[in-house]
């Protein structure tokens, strides 16, 4: 039987029920290698990142570029050759996986009082902000350089633009602060924005809503999206209905 823990904290063991408790998480293991997770709370972004590693162990690649990910304990290393990625500028961040907020932290945080007083760091004291920041549905494994370059830029269409990252068709207009993501990520992006809009009232402009509606239709839910959604539900306890409804159609 394979054990798993997020933090090295004292273990409570119940041999009869086969239950292992770490921190505030309870993990149930069965002999058929299927594991069931019951979530009490995810307290912060750090914990969410550690959990996300477990969720994405079998991901088909990095979110935007589709690079193979080599996981080493708490670190993810992208195989840049596997997707033809070309480093634009930041080699250090290009050689590691970071956890990208599809809906950026700035978008759901900048209007808060804590953000106005001290930015994202100050909002670490705000429980509601921390809850949104650590929502697993909004976190994706991305090449660090892409995560940094995307920053808090909004998604959009960039006509006559050239990709800056080799065969990874990610386009960023740094002056206009607009990102055109590769097609492989557009459907998931749209469904994440719709989820965040519904759950946390994240504002969508009419232009964004129309664009995401098109992306949602053109790029349907993938098998991996369904697998990921199920894993997140088992841990976090809620569905992204914009994914879930397509996974179990009768």
Curated annotation (Swiss-Prot):
Q: Which UniProt keywords apply?
A: Endonuclease, Hydrolase, Nuclease
A molecular function GO annotation: deoxyribonuclease I activity
Q: State the reactions this protein catalyses.
A: Endonucleolytic cleavage to 5'-phosphodinucleotide and 5'-phosphooligonucleotide end-products
Q: Record's superkingdom? A: Bacteria
The EC designation for this entry is 3.1.21.1
Presence of keyword rRNA-binding = no
InterPro entries under this entry? Endonuclease-I, His-Me_finger_sf
Tell me, what does this protein do in biology?
Has double-strand break activity.
According to its UniProt record, which protein family does this protein belong to? Belongs to the EndA/NucM nuclease family.
Entry's PANTHER family? ENDONUCLEASE-1
- Name of the featured protein: Endonuclease-1
Which organism does this record belong to?
Buchnera aphidicola subsp. Acyrthosiphon pisum (strain APS) (Acyrthosiphon pisum symbiotic bacterium)
